[in-house]
Every structure is written in structure tokens, then in C-alpha cells.
């Protein structure tokens, strides 16, 4: 069962970086559900002079999917959201943190108790690189200045220290980042994923299977039987898809090739 404790390795990593931050923390999150250790760390960081800024998602009614989001917003004076923009149905679905302009944490985990407790399965990556942090900072500054979704400028730079970084929608992450990796795979493609709906991804996975690549997926059960899911198409192409059916969510969005 999920709890409110910061018991997962993911939460502990985020907490450690909040506690060790010396000057700045910039966060772009989908939403928040209460994890007391995170709230305490944020309060302590601000008390020792760390400047914290927050960007979060709201819908067309200025609401957030998580009930504790606005409680979290009230802890942080410097907060902005994507409300009131022309793309009213678009979602600010980021989950990234920039610490002291030198460390970036990003991945599939929301700042929710179901993810922070380790109940749901997620992945994060911790990148200790000032140049990568600069790229994320540029994206953050656009949103903090009120540019969201289709209003954002294309990133001036998307490579640093061995990483390729694409922000949606402006950098065309699917076309420029994901599809080329699938097309160039020669041995295997392993994908743990919450849901797969994109026709172009399915087409390229089937093409990879046909050229002898070992393609395998693990999908969350919640979406597996929905009309928009492409699992059946993949299975008909002889691609094995395991559907996780335990109580929690397979919430990862990962491609290994």
C-alpha cells in the first residue's frame, strides 16, 4: 500500500538534493500529493536562504489533478502555472528539478505519495552537469516567463556531456529523439511503459521486430484494455507484451536499446 513516508530510493534522492542545496532549486512538476518529509525539506531550504521556484500544471478550470498541489504551492512564494494560455487542454507534464544550477533530476515519478513511497514503479536519472542544468534552466525560464506548450521556443542546444535532451512539444521529441533510437536499434529494445498509444512508435517497433531486433514491453494493466492502447497490435505482430497486474501502476516511460 502507498504511504506518506519518503521510503523509496527516488524520494530519498530528491530529498537529499533538497537538503544539500545551497543557493537555488527550480522545480517543474505535474502536481503534488502530501509527503511530509518533502514539505519539511522545502521549508528548511527556504529558511537557510535557498531560492526555490515552482512551475506546476493546472487545467482549464485552474485545478490540478492532485488535491495537495495548492498546499505545496503555498509553501513556495515563487510559483507559476500554465493556466490562462490558449492551449487550454494541454498539460504541463514535466517532472524535473534543478539544484544549484549544476544537478538535474528528471524521470517518470510525480511528486505524489504513490510515487514517492515506491508504490508505483518509476525511473529517474540524476545528472551532475552544469551544461545539462543550463539546458533545463533555459526551458524552466521560458515557462516561468509564461511561455508554455506551443508558445515555447525551440531549444538552442540539446546536447551536452553525452546527453541528448528534447522538450515537448517544441523540440519534436518523438520525431527527433525517440523514433531514431528505435530505427537504429540492432540487438534489443526493452520498454517498461505506462501506456503506448502512438501509431508511429508501434510501426517502428514492428519494423524492428521484422529485422530481427528483440523487442519486449511491460505495460501497466490500467490502460491495457482501453481502446487507445496498442498492445493488441503489438501482440499480433508477435511482440511479447507483459501486462503488470499488481495493485500499483507500472508508471515508467523508458526505452532501452
Indicate where each model-derived feature is located:
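Long, repeat-rich segments with strong aromatic
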Residues: 194-196
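Short alpha-helical functional segments enriched in proximate histidine and acidic residues
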Residues: 28, 192
